[in-house]
A protein has these predicted regions:
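Amphipathic alpha-helical transducer elements in NTP-driven molecular machines
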Residues: 1, 5, 46, 78, ...
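Accessory, non-ATPase domains that flank or precede helicase/AAA+ motor cores in DNA-metabolism machines
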Residues: 1-309, 313-317
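Charge-dense polyanion-binding interfaces
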Residues: 115-116, 123-124, 217, 335, ...
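Conserved adenine-nucleotide phosphate-binding loops and their immediately adjacent elements
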Residues: 311-317, 321, 325-336
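Conserved pre-motif I regulatory segment
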Residues: 327-356
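ASCE P-loop NTPase helicase motor core
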Residues: 345-348, 353-522
């Protein structure tokens, strides 16, 4: 590892989130400025740095010094001190005041700021208020640098220093030494493994309660990232014991204490095997979200609708004595100029008499055209209809298909970070019906927020394909609603003629039915199978398809094409494919760091 002493002349780029910095610095005996990269959060123009790292040649950017460790030393010359102070480092001191201060105190300037701040009143134009600003800012910088040194000494990226200081202020070092695992709870981006690395260097016992507690929380969070709302107790104990290298008996004792402290919630649930009941362990946020979703759906289904269609059907049923009476679908078909099969017609009739209903089916089975019929039925009675979907693209497709405005769920709920959703139980949505498309993409937390904003007199129609990939967040909400058997569900199964011309759709259904897809290649098809044994050849083929063949054949610009790969690393992984595609499609563009 090489040691390099330099003076920062220019900061080219700095990511305040992770601290990654690109800067230009002056180094003695180097004629030109050198490029330095690394986690150099909170350095400033004029900073004198002692770096440890190695030189690396980047094809695009040339020779760079990659700093792995660094510490800041104070500038010793009048010029260096003036540049350092005037860089924006100290609140209340710009280039003008930096010059005045240095002219007054010379090389003693930093000592005066550190030990005799009141002497700054001798500088023309500096009063009590500015002196206090300088004092506070100087102390803040010192604390952040102390946090950085602590993290560096414990092998942790210094990019967390500013986040830690923002959370704990002047108590940062004490907090980290007292319980480094608290950072995993309090600071986004700092996880159990980072905190555990610090704790081990500080001498924390492997079976310390704070360590076991943090490891259990980390295990549950990882399971949530995989889509699970809870973990069965036996599964959680085994996974946590493996992670923590601890006895299962210690995990059980810690788990019991966490449940007693309400850090976690334990619920007895039915299990699908011969075992009648199992204990499920929840993070509180997921428990209350799941309970909220179940409770609100039940209340919605039981409460009468407040709209004209509902009351018209209630009156008609009372007059005729026919409790299964619904609307006349033939009139709806005339309105939308469409002929529905019996299952689609049943969906429209069920939607007319239901408070909560699910419409599901695979691609090409007519979910969109059926939704159009449901909307036409509601509109014929003057109902106010709200449309929404989880993503902007899905909302746009919904608007194009129905002619009505559809919003993303976040926009519908008027999400305003950091305050949250403006639409909620105290400020509910205004309408008679809410129809949500692509519901398989909605996770438990979002569904709970959505349902909170629905008044109990409103109808809810959920549309989606349960065989699509589930939501990114925890919870398989649409499938769970269907499997509950509590709410009316209409499954569309017929693949319509227009969809039968799509091999993608036909193969999707084949796979879903456990059949091998048709991988033969031919003209006028939207599905091709190209086999490449060599990974490098596969990358070249993907680049050729995206750059030339697909845009030309389908009249689609390359930036409307998405490449999916099941892996992050490797020659055909996402990281390498992104580089290859950027080089071919956007060679002059700036790379994006994750």
């Amino acid at each position: 590892m090489i040691t390099l002493r330099c003076v920062v002349e220019r900061i080219t780029y700095q990511n305040p989130g992770n601290g990654y910095t690109v800067l230009r610095a002056a180094v003695r005996n180097y004629k030109e400025l050198v490029t330095v990269v690394g986690n150099l959060l909170d350095v400033n123009v004029g900073s004198v740095l002692l770096l440890q790292g190695d030189w690396k040649v980047e094809p695009k950017y040339g020779n760079q010094f990659c700093a792995e460790k660094w510490e800041e030393t104070m500038p010793a010359t009048v010029y260096g001190i003036e540049k350092y102070l005037g860089s924006g480092l100290i609140r209340g001191v710009g280039p003008k005041f930096a010059g005045r201060i240095v002219r007054t105190f010379g090389t003693d300037t930093l000592t005066v700021i550190e030990e005799e701040t009141d002497r700054l009143l001798l500088v023309p134009g500096i009063g009590e208020k500015r002196v206090q600003m300088i004092r506070d800012s100087w102390e803040r910088q010192k604390e952040i640098k102390n946090v950085m040194l602590f993290l560096q000494d414990h092998g942790v990226s210094t990019s967390f220093a500013a986040k830690i200081y923002r959370q704990y202020g002047n108590e940062s070092l004490d907090k980290m030494k007292e319980n480094p695992f608290q950072m995993a709870d309090d600071i986004w981006g700092i996880g159990f493994k980072t905190a555990d690395g610090i704790a081990q260097k500080l001498g924390f016992a492997k079976e310390a309660y704070v360590r076991l507690r943090s490891g259990i929380m980390y295990t549950l969070s990882n399971l949530a990232d995989e889509g699970h709302v809870f973990a069965y107790q036996e599964q959680l104990i085994a996974k946590a014991a493996e992670l923590l290298e601890a006895e299962e008996s210690s995990i059980v004792m810690t788990l019991d204490q966490m449940i007693a402290d309400k850090d976690l919630i334990c619920e007895t649930v039915d299990y699908k095997t011969d075992q009648a009941e199992m204990k499920a362990i929840y993070l509180p946020a997921f428990y209350y979200a799941e309970a909220g979703v179940a409770g609100k759906l039940k209340r919605l289904a039981q409460a009468p609708a407040a709209d004209r269609l509902w009351h018209a059907l209630v009156d008609a049923r009372q007059q005729t004595g026919n409790e299964s009476l619904s609307i006349d679908v033939s009139k709806i078909q005339e309105k939308v100029h469409m002929e529905y099969d019996e299952i689609q017609a049943d969906a429209i009739r069920k939607a007319a008499v239901s408070k909560v209903m699910v419409l599901t089916g695979g691609p090409g089975t007519g979910k969109t055209t059926t939704t159009q019929g449901i909307i036409a039925a509601y509109r014929s009675f003057g109902l106010k209809i709200l449309l929404a979907a989880p993503t902007g693209r899905a909302a746009k497709r919904m608007t194009e298909a129905t002619g009505l405005e559809a919003k993303t769920i976040h926009r519908l709920l008027e999400c305003k970070p950091p305050e949250g959703y403006q639409k909620n139980e105290d400020n509910p949505l205004d309408g008679d019906v809410l129809i949500i498309d692509e519901c398989s993409m909605i996770d438990m937390i979002l569904m709970n927020a959505l349902l909170k904003a629905i008044p109990e007199g409103m109808r809810l129609i959920l549309v989606g394909d349960i065989d699509q990939l589930p939501s990114v967040g925890a919870g398989n909400v649409l499938r769970d609603i269907i499997d509950s058997g509590v709410f009316p569900v209409v499954r569309l199964t017929r693949i319509f003629r227009q969809a039968q011309s799509s091999r993608i759709i036909m193969n999707a259904h084949a796979i879903n039915e456990g059949k091998f897809p048709d991988i033969s290649n031919g003209k006028n098809t939207d599905f091709f199978y190209i086999e490449k044994e060599d990974p490098e050849e596969a990358v070249q083929e993907i680049v050729r398809l995206v750059k030339n063949n697909l845009p030309r054949y389908y009249k689609t610009p390359w930036n409307h094409i998405q490449v999916l790969t099941p892996m992050q690393k490797g020659i055909v992984g996402a990281a390498n494919l992104n580089l290859a595609l950027q080089e071919a499609l956007n060679p002059q563009g700036d790379g994006l760091r994750r």
